[in-house]
């Protein structure tokens, strides 16, 4: 099997593989601002910090041993996205598929698996250089999750950690890889003013997205809370910190998430949300969207005035046309009834 490094080409539309991936399992960040990350993840997001002997930080969100980790070495930014599959057989099938399409892939060492708190994993890169790890059997912690501040908890389970959104120079450079080779399912997409594709792996409206912004790197990752008040109280905290807020409170038009975005110590954003849309992957039909990214709010405080005005106009236009959607209530019992109906 090839070593980790190069990535082969997969022609758009030439191949479509079944998706073995189930959810976003973890996010790894590279940053020298470890103390700042601890304050951010624990004090604002409400994660639990886990003690580590190495110069790094790790954080819990649920019953698993870790969901977010920050490595103190390397260039500032995203280190890795970790995706979960069900079994070792799924890893073997994925490794064979990647190898057959000339994508360099390697099995992670036992030491790396222990560091990630998973049974086994594969390591490879997407066409734009993003490090991806795919694993099975994450380690369950031996004690309950203890949030860093009073929150009801995070919405994870079968839907995973949340979602990740990546900048790419052009969507065409990565779409064949994610949709064709890895089998990510398109939820919806927008072609104006930027090409943006949203993908699902489970009942969460999207676990991944590509934004053709002409840039590279992580735009944001999202964590979903168990109660709207968790988000509102986090919003209060974010507004008290200088230059922390990136997007004001608002509601997205495709996944119905009520959220705000906070700037991380590494420069990208975290979306902190509640009420995300639940879909039925078996019947969902991908479609183009035309109503702009948000029903209301989500003023992008970091953008130039001209760009903010354009997005504001899109929101006002959608409101004038009566575009809206019912709230999605986070109720495990109701979700189980929907699944079994």
Question: What are the roles of these predicted feature ranges?
Answer:
Residues 2-15, 23-32, 73-97, 101-157, 160-169, 197-198, 242-341, ...:
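Vicinal oxygen chelate
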Residues 190-256:
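A compositional/structural signature marking long, glycine- and acidic/polar-rich segments
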Residues 65-69, 129-132, 205-209, 267-269:
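Short, charged/polar, Gly/Pro-enriched secondary-structure boundary elements
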Residues 51-55, 61-86, 109-111:
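Conserved donor-binding loop and adjoining core beta-sheet/short helix segment
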Residues 138, 148-149, 153-179, 183:
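Non-heme Fe(II) oxygenase catalytic core, chiefly the N-lobe of the double-stranded beta-helix
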Residues 37-42, 98, 129, 174, ...:
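Conserved active-site tyrosine of GNAT-family acetyltransferases
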Residues 19-66, 166-206, 211:
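Core segments of cupin and vicinal oxygen chelate
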